[in-house]
């Protein structure tokens, strides 16, 4: 978690994904208006019900968090990404 835990307006998370890591077998949603996925290094594929979007280092994708989605890191490279979630879905001290 990059953003402060008590920040309710936005949540910023830096994630190191091992090669082949994924978000699980099923699509999921997040209770937020906007989700941004930015790839720092490696590659990741964002999956939606009707499409797949490959992303490489330097690429960003913005989408509604309530849209069913999933992701998978490149099998050889893995990925390092920044997730930005607006508003924050977790609030705590």
Residue ranges and their predicted role:
Residues 1-27, 34, 84-85:
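A short glycine-rich, His/Asp/Glu-containing loop-to-beta-strand
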Residues 4-7, 53, 60:
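Short polar/acidic secondary-structure junctions
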Residues 8, 56, 65-91:
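Ligand-binding loop in jelly-roll beta-barrel domains
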Residues 15, 38, 46, 61, ...:
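Preference for bulky hydrophobic residues occupying beta-strand positions
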Residues 22-23, 45, 52, 61, ...:
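Histidine-centered metal-chelating micro-motifs
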Residues 25, 29-30, 34-57:
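A short beta-strand-loop-beta hairpin characteristic of the jelly-roll/cupin
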């Amino acid at each position: 978690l990059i953003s402060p835990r008590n920040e309710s307006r936005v949540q910023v998370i830096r994630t190191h994904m091992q090669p082949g890591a994924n978000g699980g077998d099923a699509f999921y949603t997040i209770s937020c208006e906007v989700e941004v996925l930015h790839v720092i290094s490696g590659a990741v594929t964002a999956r939606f019900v009707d499409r797949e979007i490959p992303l490489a280092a330097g690429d960003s994708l913005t989408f509604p968090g309530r849209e069913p989605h999933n992701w998978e890191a490149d099998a050889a490279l893995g990925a390092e990404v920044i997730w930005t979630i607006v508003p924050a879905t977790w609030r705590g001290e």
